[in-house]
Amino acid sequence: YSAHQKICSGGGRNMLEIGMICAEAGEKKTGWLEIEGGGQKLPLTLICGAKEGPTMMISAGVHGAEYIGVQALSELSRELDPKDTAGNVICLHVANPSAFRDYVRFFVPEDGKNLNRVFPGKKDGTLSERIAWTITEKLQSKADYYIDLHAGDTSEEVMPFVYYNVAAGEKIARVSANMAMAADMEVRASSTATTGAYSSACQ
């Protein structure tokens, strides 16, 4: 704990700290966030902009075999330069590590649950529920905006589209719609779901 305090005590006006990872203004840091209760770690990149601004969180790999989103986020995190960034970006590269490793399409192998259906999760639950709780409490709670990347797996061909949430009140619906309009996609669909990663974050 004392070493962690020393690492993250730079005193800068803009700082992004998650678990044992700390990025100060103009820095990009990578590391791991341990899931509540142990068992797995989540790979993160923190990008702390040189200028102050809101915090965006982007996640991928909620479904382990949806590799396109994982690749896209990996490329984005490499390309973003914190010195040219206003605000912060939290990149959760793989939300479902064992499914990603073992090519399991829809579920967390250890408990057979669909991670995208157990949010906001449980602190003392099964692995899926603890992953969801960790993402909710340790990552989403720090974000002003959130994008969850999904894709077809290797056997699917999916038209690019974006869902935006309209179930969490007028203000969030308006912000979500504006984010969807900024996406370069022809298909945009409103959603009243409440249990997925992004839907739960809106509540």
Regions inferred by a protein language model and the residue ranges of each:
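Intrinsic-disorder-associated, low-complexity terminal segments enriched in Asp/Asn/His/Tyr and depleted
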Residues: Y1-H4
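Structured catalytic-domain cores with a bias toward divalent-metal coordination
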Residues: I7-Q203
